[in-house]
Amino acid sequence: MDLQQRNQALVERFLSYVAISSQSDPKSKALPSSESQWAMARVLEAGLKQFGLKEVEVDEHAIVTGYLPGNVKGVPSVGFVAHMDTVDVGLSPDVHPQVINYQGGDVCLNAEKDIWIRVADHPELERYIGQDIIFTDGTSVLGADNKAGVSNVMQALEVLLTENRPHGDIRVAFVPDEETGLRGAKVLDLNKFKVDFAYTIDGGELGELVYETYNAGEAHVDIEGVTTHPCAAKGVLVNPILIATDLIANFSRLETPENTDAKDGYYWFKNMSANPARAHVQINIRDFDNASYAARKDYVTNAVALVQKRYPKAKIHSGIEVIYSNNS
């Protein structure tokens, strides 16, 4: 199989995977958080068995593992991990991909709905002039994060086997619910994944290698106000919506994702829901440096205490969950 044939096979594999809706559900506490991830797991299980891998299993959390014995002695064993869920951003779970040879400029993804991807918003497009790019029709995410990673792992296994390439022991793991806080990876049974070192294969730029991650925390703040009719509200009404906005106002706009880069830490106000009685704010905390990360968590706690002092009649509860840590 030459390079062009390999690339075509990879594209076809990717298109077959994105046709399987496997969005994770951030509202669910189950693991996997969506039934659709089971469908993806079964497809990968069948593929690994077809390749002839050993010890192919799907556990109770839809984690798929397999083992390819080495054909070379005395070399390190390596693992490859890829998450099989895609993110739910409120768009359609059904993906309608299209392959477009990009010739520059803005691209119309959906003429009927007047959906465009514009160079002004995505200047990285211009790096791929003259190349085929896989887009959606604009009604969904594509799911390249991480169906592209899954496709590459499966394609690499097929090439190793069909071309009898030399390799050491290889183990693979496909995990659910990365998008909801690395929940699948956290319960991966390492007794089924004994390797000297491993790589996570995930969505990113061509040739990109990430050697560390940030510390990640998730703060949830629940605010209960005091309701009354606005005609008799003076001195009585405590509006949780305004308390939530006051809380957010304690944070610098310069320390948000849209104003930071590289190893800058930040606060991401990811979700807010409110009504006249209650409000909820979710703040994602990110920082590479351990001391700065701890300081950011303290800042959130102190900001909550400050608004509680400002509004003593309100009931404010908060907590910070550790999502993952920087293991550089």
Show the residue positions of the predicted features:
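A generic structural motif
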Residues: 86, 140, 227-228, 285-293
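Metal-dependent amide/peptide-bond hydrolase catalytic core
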Residues: 240-328
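Acidic/histidine-rich catalytic neighborhood of metal-dependent amide-processing enzymes
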Residues: 125-214, 254-256, 260-270, 281-284, ...
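N-terminal capping segment at the start of a domain
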Residues: 7-35, 135
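Active-site metal-coordination/substrate-binding segment of hydrolases
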Residues: 75-166
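Phosphate/diphosphate-binding glycine-rich loops and adjacent basic-rich segments that engage nucleotide
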Residues: 199-233, 237-243
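A non-catalytic alpha/beta surface segment that caps or lines the substrate-entry region
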Residues: 29-75, 79-81, 85
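Predominant activation on well-ordered alpha-helical scaffold segments within soluble catalytic domains
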Residues: 11, 15, 42-45, 150-158, ...
